[in-house]
């Protein structure tokens, strides 16, 4: 099936950029040759800029963290939990310091033994604002922990 998708193009994975909730999502005043996603009135760049918890601002925080901490780009990388189908996790180590990145890619709360090992680490960023149950990752939760800083 993937072969047929590649030979027919990538249009099935694209839609016009959703800038705002105006006609055609603010993408064009003309007639777009690709259909605008019907959710453009609720999901668009303008609304993201109005929400301090949006993906836009989360990415800005991540970019700032990368500028502040060399460990984001330097040091050794070690993949963890390679057999776990729910959790993606890795550690970076640089100059005696460690960073754990952990993400739950499911809609379910899942146990994560790594969190107990890192409970004394500093939570640098998390996409949930309140603490969750110890040793558990909530649906689609991601976090970065620092140790040794």
Residue ranges of model-derived segments:
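Surface-exposed beta-strand/loop patches in extracellular or lumenal glycoproteins
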Residues: 105-118
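Loop/helix patches that line or flank the sugar-binding groove of alpha-linked glycan CAZymes
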Residues: 1-99, 107-110
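Residues that form or immediately flank small-molecule/cofactor binding pockets and catalytic motifs
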Residues: 22, 128-129
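Ordered hydrophobic segments in well-structured contexts
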Residues: 87-89, 97-103, 125, 141-146
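Solvent-exposed beta-hairpin/edge-strand motifs
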Residues: 115-128
């Amino acid at each position: 099936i993937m072969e047929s998708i590649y030979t027919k193009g990538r249009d099935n994975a694209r839609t016009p950029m959703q800038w705002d909730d105006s006609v055609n999502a603010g993408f064009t005043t003309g007639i777009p040759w690709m259909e605008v996603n019907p959710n453009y009135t609720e999901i668009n760049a303008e609304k993201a800029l109005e929400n301090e918890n949006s993906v836009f601002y989360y990415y800005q925080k991540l970019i700032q963290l990368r500028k502040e901490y060399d460990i984001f780009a330097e040091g050794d990388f070690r993949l963890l939990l390679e057999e776990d189908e729910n959790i993606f996790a890795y550690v970076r180590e640089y100059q005696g310091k460690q960073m754990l990145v952990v993400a739950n890619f499911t809609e379910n709360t899942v146990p994560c033994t790594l969190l107990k090992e890192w409970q004394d680490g500093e939570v640098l960023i998390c996409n949930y604002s309140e603490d969750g149950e110890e040793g558990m990752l909530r649906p689609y939760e991601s976090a970065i922990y620092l140790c040794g800083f």
